[in-house]
Amino acid sequence: MSRVSEQPVDRITIPLLQRWKQDGRRLVMTTAYDAVAAPIPDPSIDISLVGDSGGNVCLGFENTPPVSVAMMNHHLEAAVRSKPRALLVADMSFLSFHVSVEETIRNAGGFLQRGAAAARLEGGGKRIEMVRAIVDCEIPVMGHLGLVPQSVNVMGGFKVQGRKVDEALRLLDDAHRLQEASCFALVLEGTPAELTARVSDSLTIPTIGIGSGPDCSEQVLCFMTCWAKPKVIAPNSFPPIRKAFSSSMMRFRAGQRMSAVARSPARKSPIGFPKALGRQLPTGRHPPQIITSVAELRRTLAKSRSANQRAGLCRRWAISTMATWR
């Protein structure tokens, strides 16, 4: 029986990515900061991200908060000139989506006016209303949870997120709220592999991993790290391919193959995950139970069978209550 090959695609679109997610196809995403680097990997890349990580790998900043809207527009305009086949997504920089809804929409809309197909926005909680406002203006949004580099000063450094029960449940809740706000994809950075797998399995949108284990729909390759390893980049956020290959393009293609078979950064996740926490996380394709009243909490506690289960229900109720305060 002959096998019909998939027709080549002239331009990657969001509906196409979502269809590939449903088909179980592995996707590949890389960064692009200028017109020279952007087209090099393009024939085999699905998403090209003009990331604020350019502040680290191109401009020498220690973190991403110094990156401005003007800097992002500069890098985006350069990448657009290469006419990439991949879906082009641009990062909303620090303070570009914090001040007001109007300013947030203007900054995100500016990306589309310059040729991007979507904007990426970090955080959950209070940022979800901003996501809804942007999407209501017909601007596609990619979410980002876990280790969010723009909040590095609050986190006290580049630290793994989601090892504690309240952190993991809040991340799972935020992931579903972002999906409900119509994000077309979600980045999970610096989260334990088992938590990443639970989140990915419970969502219908594609998930994109950065140092979060192998179970996302796709993995991110920072293109510049195939040439060098800047000291400011977290070691878990890209595959260990630099020493294995002398040719820069061989490095990139090796990283691409690792992403395609879900081995970035490694099949064995470097990020630990407490077994007790794994037992308390919900599984399956349904969002975690959200308890919104004391009466509902009491009814649910009466049906629970163990002290651990009751403790987990109380934590979820606390997180649900905090979500309404944010």
Swiss-Prot record:
GO terms for biological process: pantothenate biosynthetic process. Pathway: Cofactor biosynthesis; (R)-pantothenate biosynthesis; (R)-pantoate from 3-methyl-2-oxobutanoate: step 1/2. Its EC number is 2.1.2.11. The active site is at E189. It is found in: Cytoplasm. Mg(2+) binds at D52, D91, E122. It comes from the Bacteria. Its cofactor is Mg(2+). Binds 1 Mg(2+) ion per subunit. One of its GO terms (molecular function) is magnesium ion binding. Keywords: Cytoplasm, Magnesium, Metal-binding, Pantothenate biosynthesis, Transferase. GO terms for cellular component: cytoplasm. This is 3-methyl-2-oxobutanoate hydroxymethyltransferase 1. The gene is panB1. It catalyses: 3-methyl-2-oxobutanoate + (6R)-5,10-methylene-5,6,7,8-tetrahydrofolate + H2O = 2-dehydropantoate + (6S)-5,6,7,8-tetrahydrofolate. It holds the Pfam family Pantoate_transf. It comes from Bradyrhizobium diazoefficiens (strain JCM 10833 / BCRC 13528 / IAM 13628 / NBRC 14792 / USDA 110). Homodecamer; pentamer of dimers. InterPro entries: Pantoate_hydroxy_MeTrfase, Pyrv/PenolPyrv_kinase-like_dom, Pyrv_kinase-like_dom_sf. PANTHER family: 3-METHYL-2-OXOBUTANOATE HYDROXYMETHYLTRANSFERASE (PTHR20881:SF0).
